[in-house]
C-alpha cells in the first residue's frame, strides 16, 4: 500500500522538566519517536517526514541513522501548521498518514486498519471513546457520519458531553490534504492552526470521514509528563511479558521484567525477577536466568545457568555453562561448553575453553584459555601498560594458583602450574611449575607494638 507518514515531533515537552526534547525520552530503551519511526518503516512507508522544532540539534544527533526527511517547524503555530511544513513533499495521489512522536505505542494493526478505511477523496480518522474526555477534541457527528472536531477550549457545554474523542491520527490523500491545509485559519481560542479543522473542510466538500477505533485504547495515549511515560512503559512491558508467557517462557514475576530489545528463547527457559533484556538476546533450551541479571546483545546456549546479578554484554556463552553470581562478561567474552565463571569475575575480549573454570575474584582480559584449566581466586591478566593492550595465552590443563598476576604478553603452555602469589612475566613451558613467591621468614619471640599512653 503506497503511503507516506508525517510524524509531529516539534513540541518542547515543558512538563517533562528536561533539557531533552520530549520525544527523545526513552520507552523500553529507545526514544519514543523511534518506536513510531520503526512502526512506519515496518509497514513500508515510502517517506517518513519528521517535523521537528525544539532541540533540533539533539534530535538530529540522536536520530542520525533513521530514514527520515527532516522538516523544520521554526514556530509552533499548531498541528495544522506543523503538517503544512511537510506538505510540499506530498505526492498528490499518495496516502498521507499523520502520527505523533509522543504517542509511541500505536500498532501496525491499527495503522493498517486506518489506511484501509480511508474513503476515496475523504479522511480516515482514529477515534476512541473515553469515560473522561476532558482535555481532548470531541468528535461531532450528524446523523451518524463525522462532520467536525471541536477542541476542548472551543467546545460548548453540549459538545463537552461527547465522549468520543480525536486522537489526532488520520489518513488523507496528499493532494486533498494540501488543499485543506491551505484553507486553515487560526480563528479559535488558542490562536493556532488546527489540523482537526480539515475534517470540517472535507465534510463541507461532501467528502466522507470514516472513524476507526484502535486495537487497544492504550495505543493512542500520549506522553506529556514523566508519570504518563512511566504508565506507558509498564503497559508496554506487560504486553511483552504476556507474549513471552504465551510462547512458553517462564517469567517468575511478569511485573518485574523489562524487555528493551528483542529476545529469542528456546524451550523451558526460566527468567527470575528484575531481569533486564537489552538489544538482541538469544537464549537456548533450558536456560535459567537468575534474579537481577542484565543481558545485552548476547547469546546463551542450551542448559546454561546464569546466577543472580550477573551482567552479560556482547558475549557468547556455550552449552552447560555456569555464570555468576555477580559475574560481568564484557564484549568479546566467549565461554565454551561446560566452562564456569563465578562471583566477582570479569571477562573481556577473552575465550574460556571447554571445561575451564574461574570461580572467584578474577579479571581475564585479552586472553585465550584452553580446556580444563583452573584459574585461581584473585588472578589478574595484566593486559594494559597504559598505552597498549597485550594478550595472555593459557593452554590446556593449566593450574593457576590464587593471587597470581600474569603480565602480558605471556604464554603458559599445556599442563603448567603457576604457584599462588606468582607475578609472571615470562613464558612457561609445558608441564613446568613456576613460583615467584618471596621466601617465608619466621621470627620467634616477636611482639606486636603497643600504643603509647
From Swiss-Prot:
Named cofactor requirement(s): Mg(2+)
GO (cellular component) term, any one: membrane
Residues bound to UDP-N-acetyl-alpha-D-glucosamine: 8-11, 22, 73, 78-79, 100-102, 137, 151, 166, 224, 330, 348, 363, 374
Sorted UniProt keywords: Acyltransferase, Cell shape, Cell wall biogenesis/degradation, Cytoplasm, Magnesium, Metal-binding, Multifunctional enzyme, Nucleotidyltransferase, Peptidoglycan synthesis, Repeat, Transferase
Enzyme class: transferase
Location in the cell: Cytoplasm
NCBIfam families: glmU (TIGR01173), PRK09451.1 (NF006986)
Protein name: Bifunctional protein GlmU
Species of origin: Vibrio vulnificus (strain YJ016)
Name of encoding gene: glmU
Amino acid at each position: 500500500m503506497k503511503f507516506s507518514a508525517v510524524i509531529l515531533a516539534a513540541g518542547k515537552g515543558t512538563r517533562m522538566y528536561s533539557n531533552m526534547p520530549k520525544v527523545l525520552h526513552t520507552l523500553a530503551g529507545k526514544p519514543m519517536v523511534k518506536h513510531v519511526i520503526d512502526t512506519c518503516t515496518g509497514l513500508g512507508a515510502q517517506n517518513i517526514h519528521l517535523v521537528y522544532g525544539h532541540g533540533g540539534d539533539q534530535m538530529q544527533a540522536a536520530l542520525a541513522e533513521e530514514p527520515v526527511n527532516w522538516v523544520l517547524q521554526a514556530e509552533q503555530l499548531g498541528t495544522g501548521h506543523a503538517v503544512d511544513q511537510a506538505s510540499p513533499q506530498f505526492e498528490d495521489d499518495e496516502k498521507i498518514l499523520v502520527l505523533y512522536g509522543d504517542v509511541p505505542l500505536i500498532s501496525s494493526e491499527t495503522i493498517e486498519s486506518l489506511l484501509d478505511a480511508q474513503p476515496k477523496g475523504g479522511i480516515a480518522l482514529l477515534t476512541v471513546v473515553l469515560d473522561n474526555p476532558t482535555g481532548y477534541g470531541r468528535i461531532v457527528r450528524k446523523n451518524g457520519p463525522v462532520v467536525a472536531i471541536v477542541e476542548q477550549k472551543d467546545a460548548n457545554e453540549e459538545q463537552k458531553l461527547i465522549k468520543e474523542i480525536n486522537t489526532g491520527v488520520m489518513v488523507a490523500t496528499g493532494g486533498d490534504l494540501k488543499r485543506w491545509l491551505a484553507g486553515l485559519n487560526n480563528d479559535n481560542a488558542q490562536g493556532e492552526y488546527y489540523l482537526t479543522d480539515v475534517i470540517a473542510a472535507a465534510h463541507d466538500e461532501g467528502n466522507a470521514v470514516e472513524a476507526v477505533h484502535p486495537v487497544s485504547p492504550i495505543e493512542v495515549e500520549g506522553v506529556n509528563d514523566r508519570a504518563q511515560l512511566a504508565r506507558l512503559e509498564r503497559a508496554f512491558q506487560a504486553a511483552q511479558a504476556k507474549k513471552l508467557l504465551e510462547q512458553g517462557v517462564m517469567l517468575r514475576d511478569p511485573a518485574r521484567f523489562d524487555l528493551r530489545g528483542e529476545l529469542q528463547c528456546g524451550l523451558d527457559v526460566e527468567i527470575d525477577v528484575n531481569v533486564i533484556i537489552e538489544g538482541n538476546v538469544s537464549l537456548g533450551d533450558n536456560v535459567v536466568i537468575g534474579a537481577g541479571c542484565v543481558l545485552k546483545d548476547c547469546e546463551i546456549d542450551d542448559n546454561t545457568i546464569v546466577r543472580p546479578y550477573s551482567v552479560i554484554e556482547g558475549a557468547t556463552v556455550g552449552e552447560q555453562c555456569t555464570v555468576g553470581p555477580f559475574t560481568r562478561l564484557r564484549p568479546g567474552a566467549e565461554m565454551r561448553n561446560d566452562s564456569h565463571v563465578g562471583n566477582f569475575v570479569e571477562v573481556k575480549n577473552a575465550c574460556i575453553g571447554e571445561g575451564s573454570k574461574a570461580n572467584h575474584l578474577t579479571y581475564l582480559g585479552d586472553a585465550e584459555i584452553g580446556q580444563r584449566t583452573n584459574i585461581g581466586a584473585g588472578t589478574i591478566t595484566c593486559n594494559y601498560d597504559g598505552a597498549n593492550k597485550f594478550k595472555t595465552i593459557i593452554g590446556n590443563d593449566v593450574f593457576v594458583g590464587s593471587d597470581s598476576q600474569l603480565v602480558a604478553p605471556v604464554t603458559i603452555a599445556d599442563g603448567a602450574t603457576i604457584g599462588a602469589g606468582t607475578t609472571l612475566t615470562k613464558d612457561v613451558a609445558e608441564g613446568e611449575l613456576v613460583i615467584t613467591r618471596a621466601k617465608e621468614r619466621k621470627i620467634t619471640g616477636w611482639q606486636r607494638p603497643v600504643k603509647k599512653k
